[in-house]
């Protein structure tokens, strides 16, 4: 109440921002007569003039009014469209690195051209990021004439693009592409073996379309490049027979003979004691577990992994809801957009378990080679902005995670859509029947088009079946009709059109009342002016008829977990001041109601004795549903924040490794770098045999001489030196041994020649760095999966993770240096032909690498993650990791019998 009172006196922050921006809009409008008087040539010549002024020190903020006026005039001449004042406000918002919330149909694509043009003047490149390839290609082609008129180049990136074409696209002033492609190109650029192979030229400025979908819905999505691991398809096939013999326990804490308990909120399963015993017996009968062995012994944890994946595949993942089968493959369905995601695979064995369940060919698992998340990738940009129709409900998260303010842009015309109260039914069948009846009522009253939003493919097909029974012609838009998507949406506003759509989020195409006459014209072969006039006249009549019938009617078949997704569905109606109606139909069996709405509401409704075809409409129920959505949103925000704390640790390490890699690629010679490695490795090696600040009697000189001979192939008379010079202490010995080793390395280097030596050094350093970074990622993943258990020991898991991750990282750097020094010391001097062959092999390895799109549905620190089958042609072996003991003198956990410092802790 106090906040609203203060807002009433001083105005809200959004109102103050709009007031400030309107003053800039006045400056732009004042320039319009002058700019309009310019010839086409003079208007185009403004771009090089702006670039020169920028290079002379004038800021983009100073150039903004004139640049926006030029862009608006060019759009009028080239595209026949003039930016409204509200679009100018949106353009200012984007330029200032904020999120512009603009209603559907208000012209976000045209608005984005303003910020693109202004920021492209710096010459550092602008990235326009969309949710799919279709929208990237469409928007690029739509805006190409405008930007080319203004003298700017435009490029588009997409998957499986030719390297030369992709490199050219990144060199363009403005580059369009998907969030996945930009993210994977970043990872791929950090796996190349020469700077010439890198595609991106820095992350300067990005405009993200549907920013809420990418930065919120997909925030937990890790981008992963992976290679094939060992084949264990026989295990998945065998263990797939177990879940059908099990049954779930209804409640977590109430034993009822069930074998496992399902946590639908976390999307996980936990086996009960009976479950353990039953599974163990099944595995013993299969010969996968020895008699008397425990399923949870260290040697059998792999079986636990397979059993858990199989149970989840059978009981948590449903066909036509979470995935579809197409051409003998399991294709994931994005829960946020309803789109299929070919090439993406769940990891942790889940995808293989689903393949086994469906009786399909089981593809090998993958091992992570490089990874980042959208949260961390997009925070690498110097300036980030976004546009969407729905971001205000997530404004707090946008600010806290990304530092992005949300500015709500006013509509060009007032919104007159009628948003009606929800109707709640006893069960799904009653709800579906009510929806069909409502459609029939609307059809009887006029020609209003109807859009029905569903949350799953299954629901869309149930409604489609009922509409067929009622004899109502309709179109279905879900993952299975992906190819016809744009055409279906283009005509969804036609008179009497009935369209069922699974999750309208991110569809990217406006629904025009009366249909889209231009789309119809484009389908005609050799259309004539008469065809155009006929279709346009027909549309004008249809448009008027639909307006008279009340505009587009939106029917939501259930509430989503996020209010934002519901708002996106509603936002399809009422564009640009058009009329429209929206209403949601719910049932007590809907997932949101069943899991989150609360037992009190459900019990109250059942107690009312409602019949299947009766609905209630009550503020308390609507409030309860909204509270449930708020709970889910808050829970998901907490999960994303928690994950980010852990991933920030990985991200800092990633930035160090990638920065180091770039330095290695940029240097002509690594001699100084490698010699420093020699000194550090010698110091660590000597410390293993001559402990710091120890007396001579504690020195293992013979062991040191053996290590130098075995590891480096160097015979050094260390004992003789000590006998000749009794004053030679530990520090002096380190210096003398290092000097000797480096002197011998320089001799070998001289024999090879500078060019060959530099090539060999780069080969060994990059190979070692990439190999151990890959193993480090596996170790970090292993650490993260178990770190929450530290909480039971009254330790802070986050702090423990940071400490352990630091130890792993330092250990990895030491192993990399040791590997490089050992390899360079022992390798025979290669011929020029052998060096050329090594370089070719590196290139082949890079080219063999395919990107795997990973879609993480993480609802905690562990969860299902997807990985693509497209991976390395060569299989990657799995690296076993061990915990770091408190003392380096403690026995190594691997069981070798050696001290940790002489085994897996060897630096």
Swiss-Prot record:
* CDD domains named in the record: DEXDc_SecA, SF2_C_secA
Give me the residues that bind ATP, please: 87, 105-109, 510
Keywords attached to this entry: ATP-binding, Cell inner membrane, Cell membrane, Cytoplasm, Membrane, Metal-binding, Nucleotide-binding, Protein transport, Translocase, Translocation, Transport, Zinc
Keyword Nucleotide-binding applies: yes
Cofactor: how bound: May bind 1 zinc ion per subunit.
NCBIfam families reported for this sequence: PRK12904.1, secA
How does this chain assemble? Monomer and homodimer. Part of the essential Sec protein translocation apparatus which comprises SecA, SecYEG and auxiliary proteins SecDF-YajC and YidC.
What is this protein called in UniProt? Protein translocase subunit SecA
């Amino acid at each position: 109440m106090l906040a609203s009172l203060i807002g009433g006196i001083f105005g809200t922050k959004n109102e103050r921002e709009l007031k400030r921006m309107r003053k800039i809009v006045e400056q732009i409008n004042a320039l319009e007569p002058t700019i309009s008087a310019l010839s086409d040539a003079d208007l185009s010549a403004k771009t090089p003039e702006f670039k020169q002024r920028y290079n002379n020190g004038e800021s983009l903020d100073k150039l903004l009014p004139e640049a926006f006026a030029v862009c608006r005039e060019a759009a009028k001449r080239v595209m026949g469209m003039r930016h409204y004042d509200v679009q100018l406000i949106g353009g200012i918002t984007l330029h200032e690195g904020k999120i512009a919330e603009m209603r559907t149909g208000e012209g976000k694509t045209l608005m984005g051209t303003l910020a693109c043009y202004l920021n492209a003047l710096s010459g550092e490149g602008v990235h326009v990021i969309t949710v799919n390839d279709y929208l990237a290609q469409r928007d690029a082609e739509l805006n190409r004439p405008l930007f080319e008129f203004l003298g700017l180049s435009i490029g588009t990136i997409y998957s499986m693009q030719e390297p030369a074409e992709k490199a050219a696209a990144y060199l363009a002033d403005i580059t369009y592409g998907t969030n996945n492609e930009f993210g994977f190109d970043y990872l791929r650029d950090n796996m190349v073996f020469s700077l010439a192979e890198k595609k991106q030229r820095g992350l300067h400025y990005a405009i993200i379309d549907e920013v809420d979908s990418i930065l919120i819905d997909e925030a937990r999505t890790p981008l992963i490049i992976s290679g094939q691991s060992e084949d264990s398809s026989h295990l998945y096939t065998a263990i797939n027979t177990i879940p059908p013999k099990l049954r779930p326990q209804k409640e977590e804490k109430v034993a009822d003979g069930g074998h496992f308990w399902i946590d639908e909120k976390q999307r996980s399963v936990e086996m009960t004691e009976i479950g353990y015993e039953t599974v163990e017996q099944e595995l013993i009968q299969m010969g996968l577990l020895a008699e008397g062995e425990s399923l949870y012994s260290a040697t059998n944890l792999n079986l636990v992994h397979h059993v858990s994946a199989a149970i989840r595949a059978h009981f948590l993942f449903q066909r036509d809801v979470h995935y579809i089968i197409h051409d003998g493959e399991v294709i994931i369905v994005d829960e946020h957009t309803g789109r299929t995601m070919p090439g993406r695979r769940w990891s942790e064995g889940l995808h293989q378990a689903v393949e086994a369940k469906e009786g399909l060919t089981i593809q090998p698992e993958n091992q992570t080679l490089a990874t980042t998340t959208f949260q961390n990738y997009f925070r690498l940009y110097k300036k980030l902005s976004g546009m969407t129709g729905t971001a205000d409900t997530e404004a707090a998260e946008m600010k806290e995670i990304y530092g992005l303010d949300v500015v709500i842009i006013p509509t060009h015309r007032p919104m007159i859509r009628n948003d009606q109260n929800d109707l709640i039914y006893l069960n799904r069948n009653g709800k579906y029947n009510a929806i069909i009846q409502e459609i029939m009522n609307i059809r009887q009253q006029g020609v209003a088009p109807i859009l029905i939003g569903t949350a799953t493919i299954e629901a869309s097909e149930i409604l489609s079946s009922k509409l067929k029974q009622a004899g109502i012609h309709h179109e279905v838009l879900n993952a299975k009709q992906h190819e016809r998507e744009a055409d279906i949406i283009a005509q969804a506003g036609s008179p009497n059109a009935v369209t069922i759509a699974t999750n309208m989020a991110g569809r990217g195409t406006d629904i025009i009342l009366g249909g889209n006459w231009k789309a119809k014209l484009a389908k005609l072969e050799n259309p004539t002016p008469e065809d155009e006039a006929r279709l346009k006249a027909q549309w004008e009549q249809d448009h008027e008829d639909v307006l008279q019938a009340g505009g587009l009617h939106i029917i939501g078949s259930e509430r989503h977990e996020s209010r934002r997704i519901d708002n996106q569905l509603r936002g399809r109606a009422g564009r640009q001041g058009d009329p429209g109606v929206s209403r949601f139909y719910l049932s007590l069996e809907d997932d949101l109601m069943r899991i989150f709405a609360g037992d009190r509401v459900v019990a109250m409704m059942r107690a009312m004795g409602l019949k299947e075809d009766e609905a209630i409409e009550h503020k308390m129920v609507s409030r309860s549903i909204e509270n449930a959505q708020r709970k889910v949103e808050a829970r998901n925000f907490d999960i994303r924040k928690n994950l980010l704390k852990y991933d920030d640790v990985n991200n800092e390490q990633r930035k160090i490794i990638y920065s180091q890699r770039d330095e290695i690629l940029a240097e002509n010679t690594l001699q100084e770098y490698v010699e420093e490695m020699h000194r550090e490795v010698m110091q660590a090696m000597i410390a293993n045999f001559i402990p710091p600040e120890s007396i001579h009697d504690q020195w293992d000189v013979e062991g040191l001489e053996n290590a130098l001979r075995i590891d480096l192939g160097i015979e050094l008379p260390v004992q003789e030196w000590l006998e000749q010079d009794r004053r030679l202490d530990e520090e002096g010995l380190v210096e003398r041994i290092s000097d000797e080793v480096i002197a011998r390395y320089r001799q070998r280097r001289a024999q090879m020649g500078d060019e060959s030596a530099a090539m060999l050094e780069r080969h060994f350093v990059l190979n070692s760095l990439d190999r151990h970074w890959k193993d480090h990622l596996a170790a970090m993943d292993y650490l993260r999966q178990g770190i929450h258990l530290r909480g039971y020991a009254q330790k802070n898991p986050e702090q423990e993770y940071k400490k352990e991750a630091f130890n792993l990282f330092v250990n990895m750097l030491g192993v990399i240096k040791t590997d490089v020094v050992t390899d360079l010391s022992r390798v025979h001097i290669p011929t020029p032909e052998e060096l050329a062959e090594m370089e070719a092999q590196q290139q082949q390895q890079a080219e063999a690498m395919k990107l795997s799109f990973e879609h993480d549905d993480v609802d905690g620190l562990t969860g299902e993650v997807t990985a693509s089958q497209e991976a390395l042609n060569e299989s990657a072996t799995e690296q076993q990791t061990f915990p770091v003991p408190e003392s380096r003198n403690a026995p190594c956990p691997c069981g070798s019998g050696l001290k940790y410092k002489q085994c897996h802790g060897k630096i």
